[in-house]
Amino acid sequence: YKRQIVCSGGDGTLDEVVTGVMEKKSSIPIGYIPAGSTNDFANSLFMPKSMTDAASMIMEEKLYHCDIGRFNNQSFTYIAAFGLFTDVAYQTDQDLKNILGHVAYLLEGVKRLFDIKSYHMRIESEELTVEDDFIFGMITNSRSVGGFKNLTGKNVDMNDGLFEVTMITRPKNPLELQEIMTAMLTAEDNTDLIHSFKSARVTITSEEPVPWTLDGEYGGSHTQIEIENCHEALNLYLKSTKNEETRSIGISPLINKKEK
């Protein structure tokens, strides 16, 4: 019989499955039926929103080789983040999430707007080295974060071997905060307050332990982390999409297992 894993749930559920597969250094195919509050990963790959359609997609047995992140000795599927709002996903009450869905995250996030904490960090990669006070940072392989699209920038390719890195420095006044929010919402890199670049490997050190979120789940507090892109490490069942969507996320190549 054919060995494969099929799971249903949100981004956190998929993270648990991928973590187990990565720990075993397995190449077993994974079928994913999105059923969470936000489903960032599924939306980034234009997966069917219908559970029945998602199951049918898995039955087609077409594989997409997706990049996966290594975070010290842990794994993440699409995002490692710290700072403002990043604990909302795992601190929002589960009953509230079940009732309100994505709105529950927004309500929890609004409560944090006036409690902004910064961390002094040094960010090192082949592309950029910078040291500053940061209120937020994310290393992503996704077109959607927290249900919002384009926050990670344009031309995101989920199997190019590179992460999209976004680091936001501490604003000194309300005008700078507004400048940051405008740049993030419009996906325009037109402010010196945000450092955005692509990289396969990033090292981040901090003066104090910083709480991290991995795929919406608590990833522990750390003073030094090494983040590495594991190129095409995940074998995921995924159907072909429209040409314009395919180009925007880098869905290539798809392999039909039945033809091998």
What is each of the regions a protein language model found here?
Residues L96-A104, G153-L175:
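Gly/Ser/Thr-rich active-site loops/lids in small-molecule metabolic enzymes
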Residues E16-V18, A42-N43, F148-K149, L177:
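Short glycine-/acidic-enriched loop or helix-start segments at secondary-structure transitions
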Residues S8-G10, A35:
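Glycine-rich beta-strand-to-loop/alpha-helix junction loops that act as flexible
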Residues Q74-D87, E131-N141, V145-G146, E164-M167, ...:
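Short hydrophobic-aromatic micro-motifs
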Residues E23-I139:
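Catalytic core of DAGKc-family lipid kinases
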Residues Y1-Q4:
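Conserved small/polar residues in nucleotide/adenosyl-binding loops
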Residues S125, E131, D157, M167-K260:
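ATP/nucleoside-binding phosphotransfer catalytic cores, i.e., glycine-rich phosphate-binding loops
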Residues T13-S26:
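Short Gly/Thr/Asp-enriched flexible loops that form oxyanion-binding sites at enzyme active sites
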